[in-house]
């Protein structure tokens, strides 16, 4: 018999949407997180500014909520976190709505896996359409890539094929956002 911990672990390891840039664009460090240690572990930390502009973390800056790192997370290998025992507080605390639904017995694990697979397929479709439109930056969160591509295409003249691909992208991104907001992350309470 599987324990609730092993079921949760299986779901999280199957998913990874909170680490791979699909749900979040960045992760803000919390009080108590050691920026210095996380940087040594390979996270590309930046200072968060009020304007959302960021700069590299200077030596000597060690902790606090002023730091963040971009998604997709550089410690995520596609299946699991490579710094799991020392991951930031926000990562330790986050549980998506789908996982909570399984833990409460409202969703069967098999149903959760199907939902994850659907979301991953939809994210893959968005990535493919972004590539077709010239955006190959796999190190940037999906939402940021979509905004960057949208802005670029809206500012210039585009041919009919590009317009058709962009309309497909817009619909695919909308469908992905629906799945994410309904099943994974309805937003801050």
PLM region spans:
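Hydrophobic scaffolds flanking metal-cofactor catalytic centers in soluble metalloenzymes
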Residues: 1-189
């Amino acid at each position: 018999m599987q324990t609730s911990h092993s079921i949760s672990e299986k779901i999280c390891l199957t998913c990874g949407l909170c680490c791979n840039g699909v749900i979040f664009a960045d992760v803000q460090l919390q009080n108590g997180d050691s920026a210095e240690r996380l940087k040594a572990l390979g996270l590309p930390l930046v200072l968060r500014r009020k304007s959302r502009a960021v700069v590299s973390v200077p030596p000597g800056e060690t902790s606090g909520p002023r730091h963040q790192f971009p998604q997709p997370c550089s410690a995520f290998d596609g299946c699991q976190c490579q710094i799991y025992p020392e991951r930031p507080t926000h990562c330790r605390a986050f549980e998506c709505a789908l996982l909570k639904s399984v833990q409460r017995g409202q969703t069967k694990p098999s149903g959760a896996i199907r939902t994850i697979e659907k979301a991953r397929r939809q994210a893959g479709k968005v990535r493919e359409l972004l590539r077709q439109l010239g955006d190959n930056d796999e190190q940037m969160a999906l939402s940021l890539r979509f905004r960057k591509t949208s802005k670029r295409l809206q500012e210039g003249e585009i041919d009919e094929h590009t317009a058709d691909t962009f309309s497909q992208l817009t619909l695919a991104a909308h469908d992905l956002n629906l799945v994410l907001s309904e099943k994974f992350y309805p937003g801050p309470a």
